[in-house]
Amino acid sequence: MSDSSHETPASARFGAAVALSVALVHGVILTGCGDAPSGGSGLAVQTTAAAPQPAPTPTPDQLREQLDRVLEFTEHGRVMSLEKHAAWQLLHGVLAFGPNFRIKSGDQMVVALDWVFAGKPMRGWTLTATEYGVKAEIEPGKLGQGHDDQWLAIISQWQVPATREIVVAGQTYRLRDMVKRSMYDCWNGKEASWSDIVLSTHLRPIDQTWTARDGREWSVERLVSMEAGPIYDDDAGAELINMSACGGTHRLIGLAIALNNYRSQHPEIADDQLAGGWLAAHRRIQWAIRQARDFQNPSGAFSTQFFQRSANSANLDEHLAATGHTLEFLSFALPKSELDQPWVRRAVGYLCRLLERTRHIDLECGALYHAAHGLVLYRMKVYGPRETDVAVAAN
């Protein structure tokens, strides 16, 4: 990885491109995500993916058209299947495109959530019914859930109702039974980025308290405070972010969604009236927005070191992961007026170009679908839903 945006010698660029092409071949075998059309070479893609020259700022109309092309292909041109992929990959597709996201089962296309909620088999989707609610088990590797409440957080971001039925070991439960288990599984030191999303989305009023497995009283604000760190210790807060999964973006996304949900239930509270964990979350979010903008590369890509420092890379996968995850966070954290600023438009344009140039490459699922989710959120917030989204909702 290079930490500089200066021009790289041609020989070094070629060597990095060759190394990447080998890595991408192995990535297709181990972590590829969907059957993409064949053709083209990774070499041509890579030498443009890390180009240091300043990127033009697309017009709003140009960007909307580019977004729609990229999202249409990513949703429908890349197809995942129950035979080739596990819950870790398939649920990332749901994260990007919502509860109607379709996958292959044999020769047929099925709705991923309908399939698994009906109790049909999906590798890595392992639920256990307990007296304290339905628990999604954590599993090693990229098969099953990798973090507490990850599956439920994905589902919650698409406003799937808590009354939705879900079959576990032949018995019918409801999504709220998973929420109940999330409330029970709170303790000091828990990685709560996904729990913040779940509980801030489903609990009304958001200020309610409950007793968790540790026998102590908990609230959404207490979970948020644990994730955000000390209110006025910005160095400690930055360290918490930088040490977290995917450059801190998941922690920040959890904080941003929770704060958005709190504001939705308390529109009378202005930013300068926030207190406790909500104020700490606000401070961490504003810090990260500044870092993302200050460390952005001339190409429009966000730093491959996320919020720590400026960094560029010859590795296409690193750019996809960093810019995709960072845009996803910003799309939750920024209002429409700020998302429409040139610096964000350049990042969106960069990400669209990267995905257009890699249409023939079977990309790693996590980076691909977090990037797609960021683009979906941006498209919806700045321009409104795509026509295909409106048609699906109408049906």
Segments predicted by a language model, with ranges:
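Bacterial N-terminal signal peptides
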Residues: 17-29
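N-terminal secretory signal peptides that target proteins for export/translocation
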Residues: 1-12
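Short, intrinsically disordered low-complexity segments
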Residues: 12-14, 38
